[in-house]
């Protein structure tokens, strides 16, 4: 994404976040953004809205489906996106909106990659430790399995990264032998 487009994405995202806080509608808008992003994930909507050969009217019609079930603030936002012919950046704007909300309330998802599934007790303990060590509030734990780790785990949250996997320890050991 070029700098001009990135600046547009940031401008639209910050505007929606500001409205959410001004109107005390943060939780509503967060939920609506998540629902719209779920639709993006389950369909090829991002590709459709990015197509140059798709008319503005077709893009506007696609966005109107969201407007039927969204708050007035989200409706207005989607209307501005449509009127300014910016549907092609909507996905990136919405992703950034969630990031900005996370930064604002210091709440983040925690991604844990391990060689085998974690028990519920391990997940609970891990969330508590991550919350304390990273000084964040944890929203939820996203668990991924990667058998190539051999053992241990990799934690990602708030742009921080902790790798205690046996694979990385073996790689570090290998580098020290050189």
UniProtKB/Swiss-Prot annotation:
Any single Gene Ontology cellular-component annotation: proton-transporting ATP synthase complex
A GO MF label: proton-transporting ATP synthase activity, rotational mechanism
Primary residence: membrane
Disulfide linkage: none
Pfam family of the protein (one): OSCP
Locations listed in the record: Cell membrane
Gene3D superfamilies: N-terminal domain of the delta subunit of the F1F0-ATP synthase
Source superkingdom: Bacteria
Keywords, alphabetical: ATP synthesis, Cell membrane, CF(1), Hydrogen ion transport, Ion transport, Membrane, Transport
Topological type in the membrane: Peripheral membrane protein
NCBIfam families in the cross-refs: ATP_synt_delta, PRK05758.2-1
Cited function: F(1)F(0) ATP synthase produces ATP from ADP in the presence of a proton or sodium gradient. F-type ATPases consist of two structural domains, F(1) containing the extramembraneous catalytic core and F(0) containing the membrane proton channel, linked together by a central stalk and a peripheral stalk. During catalysis, ATP synthesis in the catalytic domain of F(1) is coupled via a rotary mechanism of the central stalk subunits to proton translocation. This protein is part of the stalk that links CF(0) to CF(1). It either transmits conformational changes from CF(0) to CF(1) or is implicated in proton conduction.
Homology family: Belongs to the ATPase delta chain family.
Subunit structure: F-type ATPases have 2 components, F(1) - the catalytic core - and F(0) - the membrane proton channel. F(1) has five subunits: alpha(3), beta(3), gamma(1), delta(1), epsilon(1). F(0) has three main subunits: a(1), b(2) and c(10-14). The alpha and beta chains form an alternating ring which encloses part of the gamma chain. F(1) is attached to F(0) by a central stalk formed by the gamma and epsilon chains, while a peripheral stalk is formed by the delta and b chains.
PANTHER family reported for this sequence: ATP SYNTHASE DELTA CHAIN (PTHR11910)
Protein's name according to its UniProt entry: ATP synthase subunit delta
Organism of provenance: Streptococcus thermophilus (strain ATCC BAA-250 / LMG 18311)
Species classification: Bacteria, Bacillati, Bacillota, Bacilli, Lactobacillales
């Amino acid at each position: 994404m070029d700098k001009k487009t990135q600046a547009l994405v940031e401008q639209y995202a910050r505007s929606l976040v500001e409205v959410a806080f001004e109107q005390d509608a943060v939780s509503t808008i967060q939920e609506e953004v998540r629902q719209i992003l779920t639709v993006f994930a389950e369909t090829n909507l991002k590709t459709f809205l990015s197509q140059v050969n798709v008319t503005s009217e077709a893009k506007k019609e696609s966005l109107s489906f969201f407007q039927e079930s969204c708050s007035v603030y989200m409706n207005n936002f989607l209307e501005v996106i449509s009127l300014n012919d910016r549907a092609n950046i909507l996905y990136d704007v919405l992703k950034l909106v969630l990031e900005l909300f996370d930064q604002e309330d210091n709440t983040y998802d925690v991604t844990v990659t391990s060689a085998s599934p974690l028990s519920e007790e391990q997940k609970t303990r891990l969330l508590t430790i991550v919350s304390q060590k990273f000084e964040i509030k944890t929203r939820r734990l996203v668990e991924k399995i990667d058998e190539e780790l051999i053992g241990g785990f990799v934690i990602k949250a708030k742009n921080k990264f902790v790798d205690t996997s046996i694979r990385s320890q073996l790689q570090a050991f290998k580098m020290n032998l050189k």
